[in-house]
């Protein structure tokens, strides 16, 4: 099961399905990431963000996109960076492995293994403090993963830069990936080669 369209409930006053108050905020970027991670963790097999790019719909500008309309030079919004990073490293037909992070109320995570045996871990920390976490995966007990992080300060401010660069590489040590997840951040770990 899944969801054909998702967005937030931060409607304008008066309410409009074509505009929301958080579309240009980092809060929206975190919401989109947490929604995607929690949806996958709960068993969703598909989801689609509404609307990918600003466009006219029945004569009204749908001002909800991951990027703005041509009159704003197709400027990328903060949620573009979290959504595109997640979709870049989650392959169709991947096996999804849920996690149990009950002791970390602000951290959510899901693991995916693609048909080629490569792994991606998606994590988000919506809390105000960093969290330490050890990820143990019996099917990935040695090797390393590329680490990508999104924070409010790491999002390119020009609205034109297309992606988030790898921040570093994390290696499995003693069967675990030992991580520090920054406050209010999204992290993607993967051994899928960047394209």
Where are these regions (language model features)?
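Aromatic/acidic polysaccharide-binding cleft in carbohydrate-active enzymes
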Residues: 3, 7-109, 115-116
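Internal hydrophobic scaffold segments of catalytic domains
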Residues: 37-40, 44-47, 133-138, 144-146
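Hydrophobic, well-ordered secondary-structure elements that form the walls
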Residues: 39, 47, 83, 121, ...
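Carbohydrate-binding surface patches
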Residues: 102-142, 150, 184-190
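C-terminal beta-strand-rich structural cap/linker in extracellular carbohydrate-active enzymes
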Residues: 163-195
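Surface-exposed, flexible loop/turn segments at secondary-structure boundaries
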Residues: 9, 55, 129, 153-155
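C-terminal accessory region downstream of the catalytic core in glycan-modifying enzymes
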Residues: 135-169
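Ser/Thr- and Asn-enriched, surface-exposed coil loops between beta-strands
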Residues: 97-103, 115, 127-129, 168-177
């Amino acid at each position: 099961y899944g969801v054909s369209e998702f967005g937030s409930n931060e409607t304008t006053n008066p309410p409009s399905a074509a505009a929301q108050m958080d579309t240009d905020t980092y809060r929206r970027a975190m919401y989109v990431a947490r929604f995607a991670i929690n949806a996958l963790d709960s068993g969703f097999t598909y989801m689609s963000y509404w609307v990918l790019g600003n466009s006219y719909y029945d004569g009204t500008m749908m001002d909800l996109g991951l990027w703005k309309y041509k009159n704003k030079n197709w400027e990328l919004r903060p949620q573009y960076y979290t959504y595109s990073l997640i979709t870049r490293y989650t392959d169709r037909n991947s096996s999804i492995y849920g996690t149990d992070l009950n002791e970390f109320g602000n951290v959510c995570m899901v693991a995916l293994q693609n048909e080629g045996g490569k792994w991606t871990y998606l994590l988000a920390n919506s809390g105000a403090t960093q969290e330490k976490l050890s990820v143990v995966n019996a099917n990935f007990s040695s090797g390393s993963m590329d680490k990508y992080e999104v924070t409010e300060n790491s999002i390119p401010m020009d609205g034109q830069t297309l992606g988030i660069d790898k921040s570093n590489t994390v290696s499995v040590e003693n069967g675990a990936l030992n991580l520090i997840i920054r406050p209010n951040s999204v992290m993607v770990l993967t051994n899928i080669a960047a394209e």
